[in-house]
Amino acid sequence: MEFVKCLGHPEEFYNLVRFRIGGKRKVMPKMDQDSLSSSLKTCYKYLNQTSRSFAAVIQALDGEMRNAVCIFYLVLRALDTLEDDMTISVEKKVPLLHNFHSFLYQPDWRFMESKEKDRQVLEDFPTISLEFRNLAEKYQTVIADICRRMGIGMAEFLDKHVTSEQEWDKYCHYVAGLVGIGLSRLFSASEFEDPLVGEDTERANSMGLFLQKTNIIRDYLEDQQGGREFWPQEVWSRYVKKLGDFAKPENIDLAVQCLNELITNALHHIPDVITYLSRLRNQSVFNFCAIPQVMAIATLAACYNNQQVFKGAVKIRKGQAVTLMMDATNMPAVKAIIYQYMEEIYHRIPDSDPSSSKTRQIISTIRTQNLPNCQLISRSHYSPIYLSFVMLLAALSWQYLTTLSQVTEDYVQTGEH
């Protein structure tokens, strides 16, 4: 199936080949764990078990940042696992969320009552909290503060629906914007990045909001089937009486109009994303931050004006994902990627769409931040004969390439709520 998908995109197959035979390690070098303590090795094992996609880019980070971000992720994964567990009563869950940051300093605290699939991070929380306390104090301070603020925010939305667009921003801030703020503060604390990266919380927040809104928009049907609703009522109520009505065939035109309005809302974060990424100096941090963002941009382009969002899963191609991962290693390339997908959306804007003028306006704003005539060499300048040869080689060796690393599949399905 992946081979068939590549027929119309031979440059993507070329990049699949490059990725499989060594390109992956250039973007995400393999981490040497031989010198780690047993408890830290356990933490990295949990990291790989709970999110292979994040594990790959976290383990590629330089120096002290690697362990700090690993522990940061696991602490928030434990907090998120508590929040997601519907078998825990609200009365019991609220104090747990409010006090979770204090458990970082209690060596024996663990939670054995979760039924969630990632419950090992709660059941063996003493191992995670031990490594948290082994971090430099400057990292502990950031992680504990973000954990405290996120726990308060999660508790607020336990029995509360997302009503207005302002509430949507607030919810996304608690579950993702704070992550962006925390990561930025860790980058600056490590001194691999300038203090401004950690101080500009508005743009760090936008990085998280853009990813979270993309997930929420793309996952409409999955969330509906799971009894979850994250689309803001202020928007969808202008089209239907119940959010679930968008899944009905007779409402598909209204559904797509609402979809386009929410995508237009999310696009407003891209100028902040460009500014944020342009400030980064460390290559491992840049890769860590840029790859999820370009994946999200490609995902929004795939979702825009697309009825499939309300009928099944919308995914970017594996070859497309690999190409993005290998290209998004510098700012000119990232700008070229953004330019490409903004043009793709722009040319698909229906004149009859209620949000069409707003969509065109924000894309015009984004264009002003990008280089003129952006074009990725890797996507444009391979000769047809050369690419045809690659495709012929593909037909003979595809079985070998089906062993492509699972990390690409995880990135295609970017993010978790």
From Swiss-Prot:
It is a multi-pass membrane protein. It catalyses: 2 (2E,6E)-farnesyl diphosphate + NADPH + H(+) = squalene + 2 diphosphate + NADP(+); 2 (2E,6E)-farnesyl diphosphate + NADH + H(+) = squalene + 2 diphosphate + NAD(+); 2 (2E,6E)-farnesyl diphosphate = presqualene diphosphate + diphosphate; presqualene diphosphate + NADH + H(+) = squalene + diphosphate + NAD(+). GO terms for molecular function: metal ion binding; squalene synthase [NAD(P)H] activity. Its EC number is 2.5.1.21. It is found in: Endoplasmic reticulum membrane. This is Squalene synthase. Belongs to the phytoene/squalene synthase family. PANTHER family: FARNESYL-DIPHOSPHATE FARNESYLTRANSFERASE (PTHR11626), SQUALENE SYNTHASE (PTHR11626:SF2). It is an enzyme of class 2 (transferase). Pfam families: SQS_PSY. The chain crosses the membrane at residues 284-304, 384-404. Pathway: Terpene metabolism; lanosterol biosynthesis; lanosterol from farnesyl diphosphate: step 1/3. Its cofactor is Mg(2+). It is linked to Squalene synthase deficiency: An autosomal recessive disorder characterized by profound developmental delay, brain abnormalities, 2/3 syndactyly of the toes, facial dysmorphisms, low total and LDL-cholesterol, and abnormal urine organic acids. Changing K45R: Influences plasma cholesterol levels; associated with increased total cholesterol and non-high-density lipoprotein cholesterol. Mg(2+) binds at D80, E83, D84. NADP(+) binds at R52, R77, R218, K315, R317. Its main location: endoplasmic reticulum. GO terms for cellular component: endoplasmic reticulum; endoplasmic reticulum membrane; membrane. NCBIfam families: squal_synth. Widely expressed. It comes from Homo sapiens. Catalyzes the condensation of 2 farnesyl pyrophosphate (FPP) moieties to form squalene. Proceeds in two distinct steps. In the first half-reaction, two molecules of FPP react to form the stable presqualene diphosphate intermediate (PSQPP), with concomitant release of a proton and a molecule of inorganic diphosphate. In the second half-reaction, PSQPP undergoes heterolysis, isomerization, and reduction with NADPH or NADH to form squalene. It is the first committed enzyme of the sterol biosynthesis pathway. PROSITE patterns: SQUALEN_PHYTOEN_SYN_1 (PS01044), SQUALEN_PHYTOEN_SYN_2 (PS01045). Keywords: Cholesterol biosynthesis, Cholesterol metabolism, Endoplasmic reticulum, Lipid biosynthesis, Lipid metabolism, Magnesium, Membrane, Metal-binding, Multifunctional enzyme, NAD, NADP, Steroid biosynthesis, Steroid metabolism, Sterol biosynthesis, Sterol metabolism, Transferase, Transmembrane, Transmembrane helix. GO terms for biological process: cholesterol biosynthetic process; farnesyl diphosphate metabolic process; steroid biosynthetic process.
